[in-house]
Amino acid sequence: MITVAEYLDNWEKIRLSATSKLLDGLKHKFMFRNYVILTEKIEQLPYFDNFMSIGLPYVPNHCPKFAEYVSFFAKTSDIPSYVTHLYFDDEFNQPIKGCIPNSVTEVTFGNIFDQPIDGCIPNSVTKLVFGDRFNRHIKGYIPNSVTELVFGWSFDRYIYIDDYIPPSVIKLTLEKWDAYVEYIPTTIFDLSIRGDIFGTIPLSITHLTYDCWLRFTKFTIPRSVTHLVFGPNFNYDVKNWIPDSVTHLTFGERYNQKIKNSIPKSVTHLTFGRYFSRSVNRVPSSVLVIKLSKTYNHPIKDHLASKIIRY
């Protein structure tokens, strides 16, 4: 019964155990894996320790014994020692020296945070996200445990950024870029970038997400890229630009250009945004999956019908 129950969600497990007195005791043996927001009622349950994924809207008296995912939305620097995923409020802009416990694996700062981080990020952190106003020195301050790193709108310390980012980082997001991409470390394989790109993107990049605003200048997309995503603001002609190494191609919600002869024959998975209203009847035969918005109402040829997925 315990093994079968692993295929059920939290609510289904509780309903199952409530069907008879014999099964009622299973509540103390079931592991509740689905994410829940902690309430006083949940905290008082005799099987509270069996909740494995919880969000804390307040600091409880204790944490579930078997919890593996504990998220906390912090408004102050008082962080419980058992939190694994830490999210700071957008209004938080206090010093953080000594406030992030070693249990934390992911840290996301709010939009106005702009404090020194020297010696503040523990070696347990693997994902580190800075908000829009952060623009501090980072050299030597990001631990080698970090594999995913995000910088916001205000960060402009790009010169020799390859000296600032540890080699452990493989996924990098730059919300505003205005420099030569040669500064991007070659250890990065997943790059998200928004702004003007100068120079040549490193051949280490296999996953590229690109977005721009008022102006757009084509740059060279290396043939190492297999997964290409255009952001929500991108709405430009891509004919003769996308390399034939790309297999997964995603356009953002505002993209609405003609695609005839614009999709390379290497593409197998194609996704269009919410406002796309052009014909898809001329996509290459290599395309196996086409994702379209539920509001898309352009006629689709019969031979493509089985490839369409609505979202």
Label every model-predicted segment:
Residues 25-99, 103-110, 124-126, 130, ...:
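LRR N-terminal entry segment and analogous cap-like coil->beta motifs
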Residues 192, 204-207, 224-229, 245-250, ...:
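C-terminal capping region of solenoid repeat domains
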Residues 2, 11-30, 47:
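Short helix-loop-helix/strand-helix junction enriched in hydrophobic and basic residues
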Residues 15, 26, 41-47, 57-65, ...:
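Short, T/G/N/S-enriched strand-turn elements that build extracellular solenoid repeat scaffolds
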Residues 103, 124, 145, 168, ...:
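Extracellular beta-helix/beta-solenoid repeat scaffolds
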